[in-house]
């Protein structure tokens, strides 16, 4: 049976509380790859992420483009954000995991020089099986995002592959993502309706 994982990048953002409500209503957990620069202004939201049973992941501090940071600066951004995330877990009264999941901005592409930096730091990179276009300006409609999620989940199920969606609950500019929240709500309702009765 195919397992579906949800992950969200670039938050915490203005839409994160509404997204947490949707996930709570569906009894679903996710991984939130947060930006360090957003954490100071959203400690209550980040603490709720942890208390609600979700995982916090590291999306670096500033969301710099590939090649924009020297190797040492990239490691510093990762380490700084790790420390901020560990502080969020402490605030939530929870133990932080030994290793915090890491996803670099824009993902890790072939020939990406950042791969060598991660290897030296002994850090694994978390990719995805599908990244949705909810980061675009303007974002696709909720139904377009929902349709893309369904198509990918169905294709993976037909191939007996697990799914790891990459969506966005914020942006490096602090944008809201209401279309993402609604698409996730529609998708989780669909999954719940399709689940066999207990």
Language-model segments: what does each one mean?
Residues 1-73, 80-99:
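Active-site beta->alpha N-cap acidic-glycine motif
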Residues 65-192, 196-197:
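Catalytic domains of cell-wall/extracellular-matrix polysaccharide-remodeling enzymes
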């Amino acid at each position: 049976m195919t397992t579906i994982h949800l992950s969200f990048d670039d938050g915490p953002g203005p839409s994160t509380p509404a997204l947490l409500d949707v996930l709570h209503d569906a009894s679903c957990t996710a991984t939130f790859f947060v930006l360090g620069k957003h954490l100071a202004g959203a400690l209550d939201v980040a603490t709720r992420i942890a208390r609600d049973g979700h995982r916090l992941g590291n999306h670096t501090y500033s969301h710099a483009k590939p090649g924009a940071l020297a190797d040492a600066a990239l490691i510093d951004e990762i380490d700084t954000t790790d420390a901020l995330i560990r502080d969020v877990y402490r605030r939530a009264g929870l133990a932080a995991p030994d290793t915090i999941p890491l996803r670099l901005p824009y993902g890790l592409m072939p020939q990406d020089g950042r791969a060598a930096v991660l290897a030296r730091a002994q850090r694994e990179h978390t990719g995805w099986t599908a990244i949705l276009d909810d980061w675009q300006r303007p974002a696709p409609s909720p139904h377009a995002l929902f349709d893309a999620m369904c198509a990918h989940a169905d294709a993976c199920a037909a191939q007996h592959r697990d799914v790891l969606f990459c969506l966005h609950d914020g942006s490096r500019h602090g944008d809201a993502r209401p279309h993402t929240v609604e698409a996730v709500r529609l998708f989780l309702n669909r999954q719940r309706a399709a689940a066999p009765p207990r």
